[in-house]
């Protein structure tokens, strides 16, 4: 935008009625700019648009999705490159954005198969009795405990889920409403009893292997179960805190079925595509191959984004979907 010099002319009134061009304030065409078109950024943008806001999403790559992408990394074959299963996408988001109408479909994941070097294998599926018999081939004791473990983790999940679904608590707040919410959480936790508190502390701090070893004895069961504690992390199964990630697999939900996981038809990229379609229908503008260089700042506040090509996009709110 290199404007050529123009002959002098009488100043025109500015849009704000103050006279000269130099006194004009920059236009703010967007209420919000979302940086990154991952599934979280797209959902945020869709809800803002649903509330009547004018929203722009800018994405560096050639497609939406972030960690929820399906790509043809080998000719003729498409893969979910990062996230590959779905379950923690909240049911009300699916309903609010009418995602099935935009192509969202999940196929239940009912079996997990683990082969071993000695030729044996462990097959766990939706039939509890069949799973029990499969585990009993390695450890009759673990076969009996397996159901109890699932029930206990399910109970922990039901208690923790409301805290996850709400805003993160701020222990330093002076807001009376926030203090009241913290008090309710504290009362809720305290009311569960000492055994629950001890179990919860262990789950939050222990490694997946150590936590599972308190329940089970055979490595053929502990090994495949512990892998669930490192999905989405850069940790190992013996890293502290991975037992909490394991809990997520007992908090899943598909079509009202608790503790369920599924494979998205078309790969996880199909989920992002469905959310993007819903967002566009609500009026969200999505620009691909539009990398952001930095935030535009004024008096310590973000006023927009500056693209790598030098263009500046102003907005009242800037939301980062970067990780």
Predicted regions and their residues:
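Core beta-strand elements of the Rossmann-like FAD/NAD(P) dinucleotide-binding domain
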Residues: 27-30, 307-317, 321
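A conserved short coil-to-beta-strand element within the FAD-binding core of flavoproteins
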Residues: 288-303
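A conserved beta-strand/loop element that lines the FAD pocket in flavoprotein oxidoreductases
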Residues: 278-292
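Extreme N-terminal leader/targeting segments of oxidoreductases
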Residues: 1-33, 50-51
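Active-site/ligand-binding neighborhood in enzyme catalytic cores
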Residues: 154-282
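N-terminal glycine-rich phosphate/pyrophosphate-binding loop and immediately adjacent elements
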Residues: 25-172
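Conserved SAM/SAH-binding loop
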Residues: 39, 289-293, 309
């Amino acid at each position: 935008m290199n404007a050529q010099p123009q002959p002098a002319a009488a100043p025109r009134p500015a849009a704000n009625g103050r006279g000269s061009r130099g006194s004009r304030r920059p236009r703010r065409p967007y209420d919000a700019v979302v940086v990154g078109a991952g599934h979280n950024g797209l959902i945020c943008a869709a809800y803002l648009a649903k509330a009547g806001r004018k929203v722009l999403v800018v994405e560096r790559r050639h497609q939406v999705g972030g960690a929820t992408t399906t790509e043809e990394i080998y000719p003729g074959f498409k893969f979910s490159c990062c996230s590959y299963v779905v379950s923690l996408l909240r049911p009300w988001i699916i309903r609010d954005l009418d995602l099935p109408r935009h192509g969202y479909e999940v196929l239940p994941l009912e079996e997990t198969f683990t082969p071993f070097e000695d030729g044996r294998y462990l097959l766990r599926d939706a039939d509890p009795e069949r799973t029990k018999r499969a585990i009993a081939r390695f450890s009759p004791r673990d076969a009996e405990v397996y159901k109890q473990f699932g029930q206990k983790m399910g109970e922990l999940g039901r208690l923790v889920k409301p805290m996850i679904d709400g805003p993160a608590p701020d222990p330093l707040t002076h807001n009376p409403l926030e203090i009241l919410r913290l008090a309710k959480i504290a009362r809720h936790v305290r009311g569960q009893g000492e055994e629950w508190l001890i179990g919860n502390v262990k789950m939050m701090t222990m490694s997946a292997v150590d936590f599972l070893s308190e329940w089970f004895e055979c490595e053929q069961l502990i090994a495949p179960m512990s892998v669930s504690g490192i999905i989405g992390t850069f940790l190992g199964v013996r890293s502290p805190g991975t037992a909490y990630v394991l809990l997520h697999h007992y908090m899943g939900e598909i079509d009202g079925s608790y503790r369920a996981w599924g494979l998205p038809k078309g790969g996880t990229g199909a989920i992002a595509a469905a959310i993007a379609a819903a967002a566009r229908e609500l009026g969200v503008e999505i620009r691909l191959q539009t990398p952001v260089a930095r935030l535009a700042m004024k008096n310590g506040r973000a006023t927009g984004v500056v693209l790598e090509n030098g263009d500046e996009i102003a907005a009242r709110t800037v939301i980062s979907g970067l990780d």
